Swiss-Prot record:
Sites where the protein binds substrate: 28-31, 81-84, 94-97, 121
Role noted for this protein: Catalyzes the reversible conversion of ribose-5-phosphate to ribulose 5-phosphate.
Biological pathway: Carbohydrate degradation; pentose phosphate pathway; D-ribose 5-phosphate from D-ribulose 5-phosphate (non-oxidative stage): step 1/1
Subunit-level organization: Homodimer.
UniProt-listed PANTHER family: RIBOSE-5-PHOSPHATE ISOMERASE (PTHR11934:SF0)
Protein name as it appears in the record: Ribose-5-phosphate isomerase A
Gene Ontology CC annotations of this record: cytosol
InterPro entries (alphabetical): NagB/RpiA_transferase-like, Ribose5P_isomerase_typA_subgr, Ribose5P_isomerase_type_A
Source taxonomy: Bacteria, Pseudomonadati, Pseudomonadota, Gammaproteobacteria, Chromatiales
Keywords of the record: Isomerase
Length: 218
């Protein structure tokens, strides 16, 4: 199996968590796209979806799947999304696709968060993948200086604006040994909308696609 096939295998395993009558939270990115495409086959069984990005909403609608506003949908039973990294505690780095704030909101509003990924995403310590931080534009330089004090090297994601109209700083070379504390600290910086550490609300289940099949943690 190549990496894309591993992602699809993880997405197929996540479909098993979808029950009739659910409103399903749906993430963003290449692995989540596999889940969306598979969800199309059972779209008549669910009551709708909540998307974590405009891109995912468009893909869902392209399959004829209803997309609802989270404020209307209320508490969700299930959220399925990918990750850029996960540790053994199911703390994640997310936001490579730029949808981290909406992803974090939908995850917080969901009873169960099933994370799907290929096996390369499981790491001992978070931080090899550059950590995305969504920032209000006027605070970009200030937040970058503060992130540098933490030992990271923040780089503006050039030519990219989030669905919320903000910018992203990708922070390189951070060793995130305490994800919960780091998430809290960065989120406290004025001008930060959210950081792409998902530790205070980690995944409940991690499904990894591998050459040998599926592995579940949690």
């Amino acid at each position: 199996m190549n990496q894309d096939q591993m992602k699809k295998a993880a997405a197929e395993a996540a479909i098993e968590y979808v029950e009739s009558g659910m409103i399903v939270g749906v993430g963003t990115g290449s692995t989540a796209n596999h889940f969306i495409d598979l969800l199309a086959a059972i779209k008549d069984r669910i009551d709708g979806t909540v998307a974590s990005s405009e891109a995912s909403a468009q893909r869902l609608r392209g399959h004829g799947i209803q997309v609802m506003d989270l404020n209307t949908a209320g508490q969700l039973p299930l959220y399925v999304d990918g990750a850029d990294e996960s540790n053994a505690e199911l703390h994640l780095i997310k936001g490579g696709g730029g949808a981290l704030t909406r992803e974090k909101i939908v995850a917080a509003a969901s009873d169960k968060f099933v994370c799907i990924a290929d096996e390369s995403k499981l790491v001992d310590v978070l931080g090899a993948f550059p950590l995305p931080v969504e920032v209000i534009p006027m605070a970009r330089a200030y937040v970058a200086r503060e992130l540098t004090k933490l030992g990271g090297q923040p780089v503006l994601r050039e030519g990219f604006t989030t669905d919320n109209g903000n910018v992203i700083l990708d922070v390189h070379n951070l060793q995130i040994s305490d994800p919960v504390a780091m998430e809290d600290h960065i989120n406290q910086l004025p001008g930060v909308v959210t950081v792409g550490i998902f530790a205070q609300r980690p995944a409940d289940v991690l499904i990894l696609g591998s050459a040998g099949g599926i592995r579940k943690i949690g």
